[in-house]
């Protein structure tokens, strides 16, 4: 059994850790998988979401990908595409839908700073409603098997904790350098295990890990944080930019390997 686990982990790393030097837009343009933009009715709002399907002969589990505070960028869409490459239906909702100038979405903001400012003003209830409707959409697709995992990056990591706490029968949650709950109210309703991925040089976020661990343990929840030495905040994205630091690149590869292994275990 141990040899089998090691073999699966090694294979998944080979599949998930290969570096593509092309930019996100070029990678998306050449994907062989079916991807599409969809609009979802979210309590009277129009929620835009990016969906990618695996090339598979069986029903697949789904992963809800929650973007950073920059909004639904091309990089986040490449994460969804990579998950589909590994056999999952991935949905990445644009939580800035309707918030850009003229009611646009992330791509309609003049700068990433403008997107960050808009994200800071999003009502929490609206974000949770949008996530719930995106989850409902992907779960009820004919090619979905009903299982759902959630993953979020930075701001999206914090929202991953929030959404898991809303209790929506989530198989597992994956938090990439996002802050977590500090009390019973933020942890008591969490569904499924939560796995954390943190850069060792990201003390602003890491200083909250012990408090989150205590809140999770008090409420009988599974929380497994992993810290990658020397890596900074947003290492998953920064490792794919030109000339990444060795620490970020190593953390990126190890985190992808761990993530895919954990997803494989619940599929």
Predicted features and spans:
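C-terminal motif of bacterial Sec signal peptides marking the signal peptidase cleavage site
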Residues: 13-16
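Bacterial signal peptide processing site
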Residues: 18-20
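Primarily recognizes the serine-hydrolase "nucleophile elbow" in alpha/beta-hydrolase
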Residues: 131-191
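Short, proline-enriched alpha-helix->beta-strand connector loops that line the catalytic pocket
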Residues: 189-194, 219-222
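Acidic catalytic loop of the alpha/beta-hydrolase fold
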Residues: 201-206
């Amino acid at each position: 059994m141990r040899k089998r686990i090691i073999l699966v982990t090694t294979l998944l790393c080979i599949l998930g850790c290969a570096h593509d030097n092309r930019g996100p837009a070029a990678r998306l343009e050449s994907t062989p998988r079916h991807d599409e933009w969809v609009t979802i009715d979210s309590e009277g709002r129009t929620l835009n979401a990016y969906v990618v399907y695996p090339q598979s002969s069986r029903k697949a589990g789904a992963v809800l990908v929650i973007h950073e505070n920059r909004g639904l960028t091309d990089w986040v869409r490449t994460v969804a595409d990579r998950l589909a490459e590994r056999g999952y239906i991935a949905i990445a909702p644009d939580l800035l839908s309707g918030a850009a100038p003229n009611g646009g979405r992330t791509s309609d903001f003049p700068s990433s700073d403008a997107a960050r400012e808009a994200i800071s003003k999003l009502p929490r209830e609206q974000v949770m409603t949008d996530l719930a409707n995106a989850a409902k959409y992907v779960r009820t697709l004919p090619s979905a098997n009903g299982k759902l995992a959630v993953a979020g990056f930075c701001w999206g990591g914090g929202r991953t904790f929030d959404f898991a706490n809303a209790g929506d029968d989530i198989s597992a949650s994956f938090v990439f350098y996002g802050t977590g709950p500090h009390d019973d109210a933020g942890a008591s309703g969490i569904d499924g295990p939560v796995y954390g991925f943190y850069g060792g040089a990201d003390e602003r976020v890491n200083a909250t890990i012990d408090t989150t661990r205590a809140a999770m343990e008090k409420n009988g929840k599974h929380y497994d944080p992993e810290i990658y030495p020397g890596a900074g905040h947003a290492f998953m994205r920064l490792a794919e930019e030109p000339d990444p630091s060795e620490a970020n690149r190593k953390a990126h590869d190890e985190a992808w390997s761990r993530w895919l292994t954990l997803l494989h275990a619940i599929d």
